[in-house]
């Protein structure tokens, strides 16, 4: 299964887990990475590898990817899906909290990309999806660090696309709106409290987003959807 490996970070829950299921169903070998990664029910063991690693730790991330490549072949697709959000006003956020958010949301994307990009470029093929947010183009009075990191992810995606498109590498920025995940748990609130704080908008499911990303992946290699914003119809954000 050379050149068929799909690497997903943040794969233990939410969008990452939905992506793992969608790409596995499509027949791909997988490396699923998260800080607390356990085997996923229903995924074939013979073509699924797991690694517990912090995306902010480049050495750990690279080791995990090289190990999976030794078994399944070179990485054909990387999906940088790990992320977190602190919705508090910035004056309430501790420096350690915003530093961690930057480590996961931006440094993690840089680390994952660095681990696979040189080989993709040399081969003349490969796809990198960076899961950003509609917050990468719209500011807000809360979640300031989150917004700043997502602006960075979008700029990184476009810069890499300009640098590597000529080498056959697709870089796709994915900017979801409200997606039903467990991101609220990290804020210490229930989903209903989270939804109310946002003004009770509609939410898409992680599975719906995963299907859209899989569609982008399936397009012929000479077609690159550079930047895609995906939101519920009934939302103003």
Enumerate the predicted regions with their spans.
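Residue(s) in the substrate-gating loop at a strand-loop-helix junction
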Residues: 133
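Active-site-adjacent segment of SDR/Rossmann-fold oxidoreductases
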Residues: 138, 159-169
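C-terminal helical subdomain
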Residues: 169, 173-174, 194-236
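Conserved glycine-rich Rossmann-like NAD(P)H-binding loop of the short-chain dehydrogenase/reductase
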Residues: 26-42
